[in-house]
Amino acid sequence: MGKYNASMEHFGLALAGSVAARTVAAGLLLALAAGCADQQPSEQADTATAAAAPPPVPASSPDDTVTPVDNIDQATAAAGDLSLRQDAPLHYTVKKGDTLWGISNHFLRDAWQWPQLWYDNGQIKNPHLIYPGEVLTLVMVNGHPRVLLSEDRLHPRVHEMPLDQAIPAIPIDAIREFLRGPRVVDKDEIQHAPYVVEFTDEHVIAGQNSGVYVKDLPKNSAASWSVVKIGQPYIDPDSHETLGFEAIPTGEADLREYDKEVAEMMLTRSPQEVEIGNRLLPLEPESFKADFYPHPPAKPVEGRILSVYNGLSQITQYNIVAISRGSRDGLDPGTVLGIYQTARKVSDPYDDGKVALPEQKAGVLMVFKVTPRISYGLVMTETRPAHVLDKVRAPRSSSR
């Protein structure tokens, strides 16, 4: 890696070695056992290719000078706009159950600045993955505080490790139920989707192990389908554009007998009652990739909260929200946005008219699933009550 201070040896970093050694050491950071593999069909589906690329983590250079941090005051004095915590650890051992967001919060007041803090040599595939047992060390690189992977980790990374063993960016338990929940579809997708016309037992509703008749099922199509109820439209409160429709899963169905007019299917899963008129959509993959990390939006963006998963009225930490911006607006998994209460106007007690109150920051969310027009985010921090129609945009740095 270049010119390393001899005193680095007591950190066990061994960073001055060969390119191979640097490659092993650099395969780190912010993984996320959670990056959205359950993408939407048709226009809604192209999330991976449509999403803007996240800000690149600055790669190392052979000419970098890396020196140890003797005390945290030395690092914070050189942090500049980086919100390095006064109580940041000089070393941190990654534990099972950690998240990248949580680790970033150990070092930074603004966890979304992680790409500025992380030191990556960019020479291996998936350089932003961190695994339990690895040791992160705070150092100075060319006079600026950075965090890198120490050779003093508990379990040296000899071979490339599987994605699903890396720590996630966000707590997976907070979104697990949602991953089999609603999705966003457009009007054209709805109109061309097969639909339930009757039940084999002639009941008005059906559940698991019930037979259903389905019209317009494509020939040679998949054997298993998701059954959904079309819910509310998502409408941009500012432009009034219809962004899509909520498709709420009511069950899953397997093909029993195909007919070009009406196919017979069996409900293999039914979290809700299936009704005549419910539409069928292709099943979404259940895996949730771990390949994104917290970062600010790639370009200026402002939107609004459209809804809260499970219909809650007040938004708190680890609630899931739908927002009115998507991949076409530059959002991708890992994008961090600030939540700002909609400015209120109150009556002036001594003068006719209204007084506009200042906008207040209510929290921070991280996007974990995107469609072209709508994204879903997990509320990571909450400082004030937030509600539907509150604004979201790039977060303000606490160092300012």
Where are the predicted features?
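A detector of low-complexity, intrinsically disordered, Ser/Thr/Gly/Pro/Ala-rich segments
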Residues: A6, A21, A45-T47
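Sec-dependent signal peptide hydrophobic core
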Residues: A20, V24-L28
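N-terminal secretory signal peptides that target proteins for export/translocation
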Residues: M1-V19
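Surface-exposed, polar/charged interaction patches used for macromolecular assembly or partner binding
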Residues: G2, A37-R400
